Amino acid sequence: MEKLLDLSGILDEETFHEYVSKRLDFPGYYGFNLDALWDCLRDLAMNNPGIQIRLEGLADFRSRNPDWAHKAIQCFLELEEESGARVLKFDDSPSGEGLIHDA
């Protein structure tokens, strides 16, 4: 199973949590914080052995949210390290699936 997260259009922490929770089908009680992200990612990996999460648009995500983006991305890297889930990282957005915002 592969899940795609194109983070190129993420403007802030709130947008990130809304987008990720929908794309990864997190439960309704998701807490919209990094602890809740970790808990739900871990549950996702445990319930879907061999899952692959494709992170795209990392350059744009980091440029808009430099400090916070590092912490969020770290959750995914730790997931890969601890659970065996595979996390693919792309600075660009080859899928073009990211959020679009009016300038």
Language-model features and meaning:
Residues M1-G28, L44-A103:
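N-terminal intrinsically disordered, low-complexity segments enriched in P/E/S/T
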